[in-house]
Amino acid sequence: MTVPDPARRDRMIQAVRAYFDACNAASRDRFAAVLSDDCVHWFPPEAGGPYLGRDAIADLWIGFVRAKGSRWTIDRLVCDGEEICVEWTHFKPNVGERIRGSEWYTFDAGGKIDGIWAHYASPRDPDRPANELEGFDYAARAYPTAAPELDAELGTERERNLANEPSA
């Protein structure tokens, strides 16, 4: 068994956290810093995708921020030194929804994210404001249940980035 390189592991974790910051900031520059040009993002059936390439992924999440006020949290993160698995919450405050899921991340030789596999608890049900595991007490386990406030710097960056994006 190969012993994971702690420095590589730390860079991978930083890249995934920076990816979530890119989503929350709606920042093409931040996406460029962490996603490979040919990154692929796969989704469950009927959820769209796969999205091929960094620009397609950035377009997707910037569109969600613009339309739904989307915000994401990392609720759990596991890294074995080769891949990362994240459990997350995607808040959509403009439409009163949230969805929880998990994703696997792979990385290219340069340390950029080159693959993302999204898994949801169930297919997206538009009649439910919270698509979550049935009977799982998120609040008791200290999961967020409301969209987080963005820190002032990230919020300002987000507004600036959205102002510079063409409207859909």
Residue locations for each model-derived region?
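Charge-dense, low-complexity intrinsically disordered segments
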Residues: 2-6, 10, 48-51
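Short, solvent-exposed secondary-structure junction/capping segments
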Residues: 17-24, 33-47
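Short solvent-exposed beta->alpha transition segments
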Residues: 40-61
